[in-house]
Every structure is written in C-alpha cells, then in structure tokens.
UniProtKB/Swiss-Prot annotation:
Subunit structure: Component of the Sec protein translocase complex. Heterotrimer consisting of alpha (SecY), beta (SecG) and gamma (SecE) subunits. The heterotrimers can form oligomers, although 1 heterotrimer is thought to be able to translocate proteins. Interacts with the ribosome. May interact with SecDF, and other proteins may be involved.
Protein name: Protein translocase subunit SecY
Membrane topology, Extracellular segments: 48-59, 136-153, 204-244, 314-364, 447-451
Protein origin, superkingdom: Archaea
Intramembrane segments per UniProt: 60-67, 68-79, 80-88
Source species of the chain: Haloarcula marismortui (strain ATCC 43049 / DSM 3752 / JCM 8966 / VKM B-1809) (Halobacterium marismortui)
Designated gene of the protein: secY
Membrane-topology descriptor: Multi-pass membrane protein
Length: 487
C-alpha cells in the first residue's frame, strides 16, 4: 500500500473553498477581491489578546512585508506557513518523491491540494509555537494572566490559538481570491503590505507619530531647519543622497522601470489554427517567465534560517562563536551572520562607520547573499515552472488542446514540446537569476520606506500582472467566445 492510499482518507477531507460552477462576472470578482483585502487590513490591526506588546520583539524584521506579516496581530505568521509548505512540496516534487501526476490525474490533483493544506497547518504549528514558547518573541502579559487566573502558560496557549486561527484564515482568504477573485491572494497581500510602507516612506512625519518621510525631510532642507552643508562637498552630497533618500528614490524608480521593461521582453512563438484558416496567434515566453513569485521562496528560506538562529541563541544563551554571535537580536558574527541577507545600506557601507565587522567579513556576506539569490532564484524558478504547469510539456498540451499548432510543423504535442524546450528552460533560469540580482542590488542601495528589494520587485511585478489579468478579464467580458481561448 502506497502513502497515497494511506493518506487519501485524510487528504480528500481537507476543507476547501468551493469552485464557481460557471463564469464569474468581472464585477463580482472585484467585489470578492476587495472584500478579502479589506478583511486582511482589518485582521492586521487586530492585536493578539494577552500579548505584552511593549516586550515583544520583531520576528521577521524586513521580511515582514514579503511575508505579509502583521507584527503583534492575528496575522503575525502572514503567508510564511504557506510559502514554507510550498518550498517543501516543490523540493519533494522536484526529487520525484511524491509520485503525483498533477497534470493528468484528477485524483492526484486532489491529493496534492490536500497535502499542501495539511503541510500549511503543520508549518503554522512549527513556526508559531517557537515564537510563543521558545524565543521570547511574543511574551505573555502577566496582568492578563492574573486577571484570567490561567497563568502565563495559559495565556501563551491563548496567543498561539489566535495565531493558528490567523494562519488558517489567510490560507482560505488566498483560496477565495484564487477561485472567486482577480489575481493571487498571496500576491495581493504582499502588494498591500509593501504599498503601505512605500506611502509611509513618502508621507510620514513626526507630528503624525511616525518617523520622517521623504517629503517632510526635504521640507526641513528647503526651509533651512536642517542644514545639508555644501552639496558639492562629500559630506553635503552624502547628506542629500542618504538622509534625503535621493538614492532610495532613484533605486525605487529604477526597479520599477527595469521590472516593467523586463516584463515586456519576450520571445514570441507563432501559432496558427489548423481548423480555422487565417486564425493566427503568438505564444509569448517572457524574460521573467516564472514571475518573481519564486523569489518569495528564497527569501522565506533565508527568513526561516535566521529565525532558527535567533531561537537557538535565545535557548542556549550563547552559541559557539562559529555558529553565531548576537547583539540586540541581530547576528554580528559566525555562520548565521554570513547567511543573513543584506537588508540595507548600513549592512555593507563600512565607510559610513555603521558596521563593526571587518571589511572582509562584510564583502564575504555580500558575496554569499548574491550567490544565494542568483542560484536560488534560478533553481526555484525552475521548480515553480514545473509545479505550476508552465513547463514545455504542460504548455505544449495546452496549445495542442486549444487547436493551435506551430506553422511549418506537424500538429503533434511532441513537436510543440521540442520547440518550447529551446526557449522555456533557458529563459526560466536567466529570468530567475536576473530577479535575484535586482533584489540584492535594491537592498544594498535602499528604497523608499525601507521596503526590501524583494518586496519592491514583487509589488511591481504582481501589479503589472494584475493589470494584464484585468485587461484579459475585460476582454472576455466583451467577447465571451474568448473565454475558451484563455481557459
């Protein structure tokens, strides 16, 4: 008896959002999407009952925007468990250990979806329990424990229960948008979090109870309330570029432009319809073929490694120096320091006197981060293409089933697949590595609002794809016959 026969009774009974029986009108899709986004914003402002907020620590740091996490809220875990479960499934699927044919076998498709949800529930527990009980990241409020009479341990379990509910909610919110809305729930949650930080980086001011945004900082420069020194001198130029966030603004605009341009770069394979004379089309293989979503997997893997290091440091008191040394919850040496991604200019600009590490250690850390993002971006892009039916074989079947063929070639799935194999694997690797390079460079130069480079890349790419999907939906609303072509 295989593992599929053993696990099938459980996996097929995993709760799921019902698929629409027919076509969902575009306006209704927008309603579902907007409603789920409003619910997400609401839940990120629902604080965990029983949490000592003043003593709590930021768990994910700058990874929070990528993981759509709301610090100290019921959305504390964000999409982290979903992403981690996807990493595990992609690694198992890539090694062909699951034995699931998700392309042609409906039973295996149901088992895969059930296994994914089961893994998400496991990851919610594996991520949430250490936050509450092991690392001291989310301490219980003793006043609440005394008033309820359940002790500190009881309040800790209460905090974990709320986080568990939040993790399950975001899982099904993502599924609702995927089936009834526009775009991907995970992508929209990331866009929502990053957009908040971008707007905050522009508009915040001390009198609003926040730090200084770009507009307020330049108001101080222009009115003379804050001096810059001679702009042509080194100190003055540094003040304008760094404190005035001109460098961050330039990087943000540059990333927007590069991603939009990269999304438009493509190889177009001509197609024709064998049954309808004169009907022609093109299949685009974009430079960023796998999208930037696989980059979430790379950053989530790094976030989990850093999370593990902080837990070990909290539990052991002090780890062996070769593993890691910590100050204020951040690695300052050892293996975990070298594996920590570059998050800001202060992590590597040693000439600003903001780093305590020797130059060789800083450069080694930069090199490791660059290597991880380039190789990881390419590898996870390949996994993503294969597991989302975007590979040559699955795409060839889709083209063949739609009645299209490549002019000058026989109408055969194998022939179409061979043509696609000339482009898709190579473009996937190049695009994944390019996205990794852009993410590292954006982090090193800094962006508006302290948004991570990966978060900015994700936001731009997801927004661009959302625009394309909305245009496609509107086209299908105007021409219902197009629904069969788009699927």
């Amino acid at each position: 008896m295989s593992w599929k026969d053993t696990a099938e009774p459980l996996l097929v009974r995993m709760p799921a959002v019902q698929r629409p029986e027919g076509h969902v009108p575009f306006k209704r899709k927008l309603t579902w999407t907007g409603g789920v986004l409003l619910l997400y914003f609401f839940l990120t402002n629902v604080k965990l009952f029983g949490l000592d907020i003043d003593a709590s620590q930021q768990v994910f740091g700058r990874f929070s925007s990528i993981l759509a996490s709301g610090q100290g809220s019921i959305m504390q875990l964000g999409i982290g468990p979903i992403v981690t479960a996807s990493i595990v499934l992609q690694l198992l699927g890539g090694a062909d250990l699951l034995g699931l044919n998700t392309q042609d076998d409906p039973r295996d498709q149901i088992l895969y979806q059930g296994l994914q949800k089961l893994l998400v529930l496991v990851m919610i527990c594996l991520t949430g329990l250490p936050m509450v009980f092991a690392g001291g990241f989310l301490p219980a409020d003793t006043a609440v424990a005394n008033s309820l009479g359940i002790g500190t341990a009881g309040v800790q379990w209460l905090i974990f229960a709320q986080m568990f509910v939040g993790g399950v909610l975001i899982l099904f919110m993502d599924e609702v948008i995927s089936k009834w809305g526009v775009g991907s729930g995970i992508g929209l949650f990331i866009v929502a979090g990053v957009s908040q930080r971008l707007v905050g980086g522009l508009l915040t001011a001390p009198f609003l109870g926040n730090s200084e945004g770009i507009i307020y900082t330049w108001y101080l420069f222009i009115t003379g309330e804050r001096g810059t020194g001679p702009v042509l001198a080194a100190d003055g130029l540094q003040t304008v570029l760094l404190q005035g966030e001109l460098l961050g603004l330039f990087t943000t605009v540059l990333i927007f432009a590069v991603v939009v341009y990269a999304e438009s770069v493509r190889v177009e394979i001509p197609l024709s319809n064998a049954r309808v004379k004169g009907a022609r089309g093109r299949f685009p293989v974009k430079l960023i073929y796998a999208s930037v979503l696989p980059m979430i997997l790379v950053r989530a893997l790094q976030a989990n490694i850093q999370f593990l290091g902080r837990i070990l440091n909290a539990q052991l008191g002090s780890m062996p120096a070769f593993l890691g040394t910590y100050a204020n919850g951040q690695p300052t040496g050892g293996l975990f320091y070298f594996l920590a991604p570059i998050q800001s200019r202060g992590d590597w600009m040693w000439w600003l006197e903001g780093t305590a590490q020797p130059v060789w250690q800083i450069l080694t850390r930069v090199g490791i981060d660059l290597f991880v993002m380039l190789v990881g971006g390419a590898v996870f892009a390949v996994f993503w293409v294969e597991t989302t039916d975007m590979g040559p074989e699955a795409t060839a079947k889709q083209i063949h089933n739609s009645g299209m063929q490549i002019p000058g070639f026989r109408q055969n799935v194998g022939v179409i697949e061979k043509v696609l194999e000339r482009y898709i694997p190579q473009v996937t690797v190049i695009g994944g590595a390019l996205v990794g390079l852009l993410a590292v460079m954006a982090n090193m130069l800094g962006t508006i609002g302290g948004v991570s480079g990966t978060g900015l890349l994700l936001t731009v790419s997801i927004t661009y794809k959302l625009y394309e999907e909305i245009a496609e939906e509107q086209l299908m609303e105007m021409h219902p016959m197009m629904r069969q072509m788009f699927g």
